[in-house]
């Protein structure tokens, strides 16, 4: 058992390339809202979430008929019915559906780490489950 994992913290998606090493786990946390919205959406039955970095990608999915949530600078982007507020997902409207999500920072943080074997979503609302999961993985290098 590894006694003390090394934990590195990266504060913005733009800094991620400067921190890249042989990390075994990346935990994507958007302290303000994105990861809380993702956790809430799953809690209320969303089947799958596709995080995209740009509005252009989000528009492409919307044109294909997907439910799409888009936020920039804390506001729902015009033309989209959902944003990054967890309250938007506290119902069964999207139960068993796929949701495409783009946010100012959160989805960018997720996408820069896509190649990592263990990419997990962290939020204050899933902190207990996240901590237990990371301990079960028993890995030595964790990047947050």
Predicted feature descriptions by range:
Residues 50-138:
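Acidic/Gly/His-enriched mid-domain segments of enzyme catalytic cores or analogous surface patches
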Residues 2-6, 134-139:
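Acidic-glycine-rich active-site phosphate/pyrophosphate-binding loop
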Residues 142-144:
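Conserved small/polar residues in nucleotide/adenosyl-binding loops
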């Amino acid at each position: 058992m590894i006694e003390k994992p090394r934990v590195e913290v990266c504060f913005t998606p733009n800094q991620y390339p400067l921190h890249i090493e042989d990390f075994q786990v990346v935990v994507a946390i958007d302290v303000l809202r994105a990861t809380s919205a993702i956790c809430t959406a799953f809690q209320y039955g969303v089947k799958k979430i596709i995080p995209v970095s740009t509005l252009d990608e989000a528009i492409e999915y919307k044109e294909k008929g997907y439910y799409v949530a888009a936020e920039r600078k804390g506001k729902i982007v015009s033309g989209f019915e959902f944003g990054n507020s967890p309250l938007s997902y506290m119902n069964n409207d999207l139960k068993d559906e796929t949701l495409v999500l783009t946010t100012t920072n959160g989805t960018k943080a997720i996408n820069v780490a896509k190649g990592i074997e263990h990419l997990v979503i962290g939020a204050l609302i899933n902190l207990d489950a996240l901590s237990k999961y990371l301990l079960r993985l028993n890995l030595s290098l964790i990047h947050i």
